[in-house]
Amino acid sequence: MLERIKDSFTESIQTKIDASEALPESIAKAAEMMVHCLLSGNKILACGNGGSAGDAQHFSAELLNRYEIERPPLPAIALSCDTSTITAIANDYSYDEIFSKQIMALGQPGDILLAISTSGNSGNVIKAMEAALSRDMTIVSLTGKDGGAMAGLLSVNDVEIRVPSNVTARIQEVHLLAIHCLCDNIDHTLFPQDEQA
């Protein structure tokens, strides 16, 4: 048991080392896009399933409240939170439409969709991306493995943050770190701090 625990730490560390080489440019570009979106008076919508739904909520909470510095709230909405809406859409239409219908109602040109799926193949996240594109939104995707079908929907205006791993747990761990990097860069770009203080 102890060895399995130690192995999990070691694998997580190695995946983060690999990601530290592969992901900084994508994360920086995504953060720049998000800053531009927010400065333009737009918002960020986020979606995912299971642990990725938790990540979407974590991201929106950090923007709506604060990350590490005192600042005004920033507009972000996790589309996985409204159980009445989600269950109504799933019951009346399809589970694949639980995010896309919300995006058709809430998404505006200039908004960003943060689409999260460890496999890149979640049907409802793919439909969300299609809806976002139809609303002239840009997309930041957080994926892993080979990027799945989500990778094929992205244009040069979008950003893919693809974790270099095939292990779901390791991908989720790096997704959380990437989200924290996004929040940190958004905060320090919009609200520069005196590092000497």
From Swiss-Prot:
Recorded GO MF terms: carbohydrate derivative binding; D-sedoheptulose 7-phosphate isomerase activity; zinc ion binding
Catalysed conversion reaction: 2 D-sedoheptulose 7-phosphate = D-glycero-alpha-D-manno-heptose 7-phosphate + D-glycero-beta-D-manno-heptose 7-phosphate
Binding positions for substrate per the UniProt entry: N49, G50, G51, E62, N91, D92, S117, T118, S119, S122, Q172
Matching CDD domains: SIS_GmhA (cd05006)
Gene Ontology cellular-component terms listed: cytoplasm
Family annotation (Pfam families): SIS_2
UniProt signal peptide: none
Subcellular location: Cytoplasm
BP-aspect Gene Ontology terms: carbohydrate metabolic process; D-glycero-D-manno-heptose 7-phosphate biosynthetic process
Listed cofactors: Zn(2+)
Chief location bin: cytoplasm
Annotated transmembrane regions: none
NCBIfam families xref list: PRK13936.1
Quaternary structure annotation from Swiss-Prot or TrEMBL: Homotetramer.
Assigned protein family: Belongs to the SIS family. GmhA subfamily.
Role played: Catalyzes the isomerization of sedoheptulose 7-phosphate in D-glycero-D-manno-heptose 7-phosphate.
Name by which UniProt lists this protein: Phosphoheptose isomerase
Organism from which the protein derives: Shewanella halifaxensis (strain HAW-EB4)
